[in-house]
Amino acid sequence: LLLNSIVNASISPENLYITWGVFVISTSLSYLYSAQSVILTADQNVYLVKLITGLTRSLAYILQIFLMICGVSFWIVCAIELLSNVIQLILFNKLTLKKYPQLVKLDITDTINKENIISVKTKIKREIKYTFVHKIAGVVVFNTDYLIISVFLGITVITSFSSYMMLIQALAFLISAIASPLGAYIGAKLYSDSKEKVIRIISLYNSLFFMLGIFCAYMFYISSSTFVSLWMGKEIVLSQQLVLLLSVNCFVLIARISFDVAKVGLGYMSDIELPLLEAIINIIVSLVLVHYLGLNGIVIGTIVSNIIVVMILKPVFLYKNALKSDNAFIIHELIRSWFFISIFLLSIFFITRAKVIVSNEWLDFFIQVCMSSITPLLLLIMIYSVFYSNVRKFMFVMFKKNYREN
């Protein structure tokens, strides 16, 4: 009954509930190999985790798209998702047994005493509870928009909205995959270097991901509508005003990666009130504004929760509670981040007027995207290099390293 009320469309109960059940089982299977992925990540082998998950998911997506184009039954398409997780489970089990055969014969009671076992179990249970709250709140935050759109605006609006969101999520997924090893690096530095050096590293990462988020958000704003038009047709294209709002969410989704990576590296998951607050703000503001602004109001609800929680409270909690930084440093970090964003927006609007790309051919579109990316990229590098010595030193080291290799 709940699914029928949420999905405002004429779909038979069999198709609705069986499809839902398949995806629930598929998601549940992913938890069966979570322990193996944790072991590999902790042992600095996160690239193996990303290799397995990346390859299987990519192949599954390609096969699903091909089958849908060929008009194959949707049940088979759903089965591919299930098969993908089964293959990942098999691969993770085989890889873990091959790399760590001692785990099969290991008796943990021989290595640590009972008091330590109880202490470790208590800590693990606490962290699992915190992580569970984070995951549940994350599911609510990232799926609230779709539910509210389905209930109040109809399922047809989701097609246009999801087309743009898929581009944003694809960017975030790619960048997250690249950034995931940084968590293990921060964790290693926490035990080998001083707290001040760890703070400088995290501050550098925040600046770099802010740069990346600003760049991706700008490129999304000027190119996403043309991409969607060429891909799915002009009737799917959203207004440029709404695309601007989605660009803000694109920026936040990428910029927040640095905070999430730092939290994993520091082992800090105690801020369970933040994701709950983010979900509550998102739901309340979206439910209120959808009656006045429609789809724009729902997106604004997400922006409000993102800015308050993700861009302000999350870094404050991270620096203050996990790194024990003083208030002056935290305020300085926040002001500097937003100062760079303001300088970039004023400069790019003055130079390019944020002209939206218009094209009727794929080749011409990609050429325009490449050409339009040069100015904002150079501008970002110049702004951060001039105003932030940490980024300037990093770029100098990278340039010097590449020069020596060549």
Q: Which residues does each predicted region cover?
A:
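Interfacial segments at transmembrane-helix termini and the short loops linking adjacent helices
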Residues: 2-23, 220-251, 323, 358-363
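Helix-terminus/linker motif at the lipid-water interface of multi-pass membrane proteins
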Residues: 4-8, 66-71, 132-135, 139-170, ...
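Short runs within selected transmembrane alpha-helices of multi-pass transporters and secretion channels
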Residues: 22-41, 49-64, 77-93, 134, ...
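Helix-loop junctions and terminal segments of transmembrane helices
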Residues: 41-42, 100, 105, 164, ...
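Interfacial/gating helices of multi-pass transporter permease domains
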Residues: 74-79, 119-127, 149-169, 197-200, ...
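Interhelical loop/hinge segments that connect adjacent transmembrane helices in multipass membrane
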Residues: 78, 90-142, 185, 193-200, ...
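Membrane-proximal transmembrane or re-entrant/amphipathic helices at the cytosolic face
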Residues: 105-108, 321-326, 332, 348-406
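Interfacial transmembrane-helix starts/ends
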Residues: 124-128, 162, 194-223, 240-243, ...
